[in-house]
Structures are given as C-alpha cells and as structure tokens.
Amino acid sequence: LKSFKGTKDGVPFEDTQYPVESIAELSRQGIPDLVALLSSPNPTISALSILSAQLDGAVLMGHSQAGAFPLGTALLKPDMVRAMMLIEPGSCSPDTWTDEQIAVFAKIPLLVVDGDHLDAPTYLPVGTPGWQARFDGCERFIARVRKANGQADMLHPPRLGIHGNSHMIMQDKKNLQIADLITKWLDAQTNEMLHKQTSLLR
C-alpha cells in the first residue's frame, strides 16, 4: 500500500497520514483474495443492485478492488443509483466501457478520490498498473463521462494542498477532512438535483 511504504522499506513518507504504528493491526484484518473464484459478473454487484432497489435509491461508495462496484451496479439499476463515489479504485477501466455504458454513467453524479505519492511502487505483480497509471486512467474515464454531458469530478487532495493520504484514506489521520470534502461534493449534487426537480415542476 503506497503510503505505508516510503523511499525505502521500513521508512514511511515524512508526510504520511496513515498511523503507521497500526499497520500490524491492519494486516491482521487481511483475508485470502478469492475474487478469482467468483462467478462473472461479480455477484456482489447484483446484490448491490437489489439492495439499492429495496432502499428506493442509494448513494454508492466503493474502495480499492471494490472501487468499480458502483459502476457495475449503475448499469444494472441506473434509476436506483443516486451518486457514485470511487475511493482509490483499482481501475476505472477508461477504455473498456462502451459509449452506451458511458451514457448511463453520465446520468449519475460521479466522484473519484485518490491519495498521494502516485509515483510510489505498488509491490503488486509485474505488469500490474502503478498508482500513477491508475490515476491517469480515472482522469480519462472522467473525461469520457464529461464529454457525454455527465457530472464527474476528481478529488485529488494534493491539488488542494492536502498531502500524505494513503490508499486507506478512511483510516488516515486527515480522514475527517477528506470526508468533509466528499460530503460537500455530495451536498452540491443533491442541491443540483433538487433544483432540476423544482424547475420541472414550474
């Protein structure tokens, strides 16, 4: 995980926001990755679409390997997904989606959130895209959604002068600051949707 590593093993980045003294506890939460054994499409996406319908609409957030789950859910139940937030997604697959699928995403507010130190190694198998490549891919994905007249944004804290966030943004010391930024974005989308609904009633 990029911000748990520094310029060399055992030395975290000076500005890291992750509580490095807790890394051992984090590692104990790990379980074997069994995603390769799942059927395709991933049954979690189907379950999310059912849950969204039961709730009569939901705002979906995905992180890391599950980062794209909101997108898959939107394709199954586009009218039940109110907004999508992808936190450090494993990939935005910018060149995989068809124009028709992009058109679906363009109808739902979308936010991608990425941390810091994109040039750090991932320590994943050779050939796996690095952090910068993943970030660039999400930027291209956002551009495609915007080109289709969608509301899509990238929240990259370093651009706002907020540095040191890790892959586990929700556990970082500045997690509440990032949460506030996400909440403000979501509030803005809610206000925009209410404005459109009000305009239709006039």
How should each PLM-predicted stretch be described?
Residues 72-76:
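Active-site signature of alpha/beta-hydrolase-fold catalytic machinery across serine-
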Residues 79-93:
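A conserved short beta-strand
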Residues 164, 168-202:
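Catalytic active-site module of serine/aspartate enzymes centered on a nucleophile-bearing elbow/loop
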Residues 89-157:
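The feature captures the conserved acid-bearing segment of alpha/beta-hydrolase catalytic domains
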Residues 60-61, 84:
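Conserved alpha/beta-hydrolase fold motif
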Residues 1-37:
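Active-site machinery of serine-nucleophile hydrolases
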